[in-house]
Amino acid sequence: MRFKLFILTHISVTADTYIHKESQIAKMACSTHKHYHDDEFDPKLFLETYFTCENIPENMSFPMGILHELFCSGKVKGDTLLDVSLAAVIYQLISASNQFKKIYKVEFTDPNITHFKEWLEKKEGATDWSFALQKACEFEGNRDKWQEKEEQLRKTIAGVIKWDNFENIFVNPQLLPEVDCVLCLWQLTVVSKTKEEFQRNLKKFTCCLKPGGQLILFSAVNMTYYVVGKHKFFILSVDRDFIRQTVIKTGFAIEKEHYVSRNINTDLIDYEGMLCIMARKQCECPI
């Protein structure tokens, strides 16, 4: 297993035919579009395009509002949180730092880890997250204290872990303790090339979640691509029912969900809507 820890058939008819065609379409898109692991993925440009300004405000306002309500109300609580979210994004952790003493960040590529650490260590060239931090502080009624909030978040990051999602085993438990909450923001459909991989990856992400622990999963619905610079990248297209059923099959009881339809006009991204599922771990599901 490769990881690093930085501390600070036959086609029949109808349904079978449809599934086969759906799989073929996904394979074609996967082969013609770039992938998250490709060298052309620019971590800083990606963040500047989607998450540090008002280009696509739904990407931030939808999850930030939900997470503020969950973490600040105490509906989700504990000491340790595992963040398996997209790229070097941090805004989903701002409210979480009010509730959790330790946050572990899992990422899949060296460039994204490097860029996340640039922010963590205040290095030159790091992404400026002041816009998101001010937005998060507005929810708390103290917009002017965003710099204090940023320092609070930095101190809460207990580790940054690299994991190759093509490995069968998740992170060594000696490096990552059992956690009270797993937060997954936009990541599953980006790193999973098939629905089977989506299911396996969700099981792996949540294997270190304590029984009774909580999963907060954000996913794009019926999305096929996103653009970074001059490149179009693949994303696995899944519908709401598939996401819900996968969460249940993985051993979770869904407690609440939120859905918002697309409300913007842009060629950068083609999602139909965004879904958030809050679920509680009921049992272990073999990988």
Where are these regions (language model features)?
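Class I SAM-dependent methyltransferase Rossmann-like catalytic core
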Residues: 18-78, 91
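A short acidic, Gly/Pro-enriched loop at the edge of an enzyme's catalytic core
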Residues: 169-182
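Core SAM-dependent methyltransferase catalytic element
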Residues: 250, 263-287
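S-adenosyl-L-methionine
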Residues: 121-171
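Conserved beta-strand signature within the Rossmann-like core of class I S-adenosyl-L-methionine
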Residues: 212-220
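Acceptor-substrate binding/catalytic loop of class I
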Residues: 193, 223-242, 267
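A short glycine-rich, Lys/Arg-flanked "PGG" loop and its adjoining helix->strand segment in the class I
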Residues: 176, 197-211
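Conserved class I S-adenosyl-L-methionine
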Residues: 76-89, 103-107
